[in-house]
Amino acid sequence: MEATIKVVLLGDSSVGKTSIVTRLKSGKFLAKHAATIGAAFITKTIEVPSNDSSTEKRIHMEIWDTAGQERYKSLVPMYYRDANIALIVFELGDVSSLQCAKTWFQDLQDRAQGTQVIIVGNKYDLVCEEHSGEVTIPAELQGLPYVAVSAKTGYNFDTLNKIIISLVPESQFKTLSKNNEQGNILEINKKKSGSGCIC
């Protein structure tokens, strides 16, 4: 059984959206990449853990990485359409990007109320573990799923994948023939990547 979902990443420039997409896609980190113009699109299939070995379940994600630069913001709302899940990304330790996450959330709510939202604090590798717990989520975003990650080290991406899986309703899974099964499967139960905290 497989579900196909559209995932869109939102957030200001330089918070690490493209690095998150790269980590989701390939499990790698690229230190240098060009700024996203408009939007970029990739696909990824996640295998859903199940206690029933006779039933294989997968989630095929169509992931849209949107531009965060001011001059491209007018183009971003077109990618909200039919999005099942939005990852609203901010940079840990950057209060201004967290405040801007509220603006992204409000714009999404105005245009696509049915979209599920996950708040993602990126660049965990740049802050100490004890300081990462000091993040105060704005009232407008409280109650939404939240996860702190590091696209650089891979920290907590297993948790992010599990949250994504939890937001996909059972009714969205469809039975496919073997000829339609997708490759490129991510085993989310792999040992999480190690990460260190350098202060």
Swiss-Prot record:
Q: Which UniProt keywords apply?
A: Cell membrane, GTP-binding, Lipoprotein, Membrane, Methylation, Nucleotide-binding, Prenylation, Protein transport, Transport
Could you tell me which Gene3D superfamilies the record lists for this protein?
P-loop containing nucleotide triphosphate hydrolases
What is an example of a GO molecular function annotated in this UniProt entry?
Answer: GTP binding
Out of the domains of life, which is the source? Eukaryota
Task: State where GTP binds.
Answer: 11-18, 65-69, 122-125
Name the CDD domains for this protein: Rab (cd00154)
Residues carrying Cysteine methyl ester: 199
Disulfide bonds, which pairs? Answer: none
Tell me a GO biological process for this protein: endocytosis
What membrane topology does the UniProt entry give? Lipid-anchor
Checking InterPro entries in the record gives: P-loop_NTPase, Rab, Small_GTP-bd, Small_GTPase
Question: What GO CC annotations are associated with the protein?
Answer: cytoplasm; endomembrane system; fungal-type vacuole membrane; plasma membrane; vesicle
Q: Where is the lipid attached (S-geranylgeranyl cysteine)?
A: 197, 199
Where does the UniProt annotation locate this protein? Cell membrane; Vesicle
On whether S-adenosyl-L-methionine is a keyword of this UniProt record, the answer is: no
More details? Present with 1360 molecules/cell in log phase SD medium.
> Family, per the entry?
Belongs to the small GTPase superfamily. Rab family.
| Chain's role | Protein transport. Probably involved in vesicular traffic. Specifically binds guanine nucleotides. In its GTP-bound active form may be involved in recruiting the MON1-CCZ1 complex to membranes enriched in phosphatidylinositol 3-phosphate (PtdIns[3]P) or other charged lipids, leading to recruitment of YPT7 and downstream effectors involved in endolysosomal maturation.
This protein is called: GTP-binding protein YPT10
The source organism is Saccharomyces cerevisiae (strain ATCC 204508 / S288c) (Baker's yeast)
